[in-house]
Amino acid sequence: LHAAREMGVSVGPGRGSAAGSAVAFCLRITDIDPIKYGLLFERFLNSGRISMPDIDIDFDEDGREAVLKYVVNKYGHDKVAHIITFGSMAAKMAIRDVARVQKLPLQDADRLAKLVPERPGITLAQAFAEVPELAKERESSNKLIAQTLKYAAVLEGSVRQTGVHACGIIIGKDALDNYIPLCTAKDTELYATQYDGSHVESVGLLKMDFLGLKTLSIIKDAVINIKKSRGIEIDIETLPLDDKKTFDLFSNGETTAIFQFESTGMKRYLRDLKPNRLEDLIAMNALYRPGPME
């Protein structure tokens, strides 16, 4: 993080449970005082937790690549890798993939796939139970249709493609191939692990989460443009947190492009609740989520 700041990379003040650690604050891993804001250390680390605690770090989008290059140069190309992800075959995709191999006409494949209810995580077994029309197609006189549904049910849940984790990076003290199998990955010079995140951690390797956050890029560009156009140099880290004009904008719902405050629903609640201090915004951001809203 020190190197990132030295390179001019925008670094987020703290994300997730790590903000509850006073040690992280003192080391400037985070910039949020957990004692001042009453944050819980136990969310970060407690006796019931077996795995290493997570420290998620936000960088501006371009800066994330610069930080990755720094890490590779510091620790070595053979000690740094992305984490592989596995994409499995869901119900609709299983039907479409099998239909393509079976050479089932596209219109029939579309019709079968559209009979599966639009619900995340639904399985073909559930779809057959809920949609009699789809279940009936398993006994279709058209052999291709019946076989497509039969084979789709067998292949459902199989790994269909691989990718790399959006932010997870493994850094080892020795060459990673001493501990886990590696592979090349598309669109990156780094290796990727052939174990996914949960297995990588069970082997004992440390996972770091480097996130590229568009909002930090926008703030960074805004600061640069203000300096160019107005000659005013703004230090984001020393901005006052009690500026009345800023809270007036929040109270009026004028928050377009403000991270997590730009939705129509949030703007409505801002106009209703009229926040006038930082703690009000913290509470609103925490509560405006599906669970608390219910």
Task: Please place each PLM-identified region on the residue numbering.
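Alpha-helical scaffold/interaction cores of sigma-54-like transcription cofactors
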Residues: 1-294
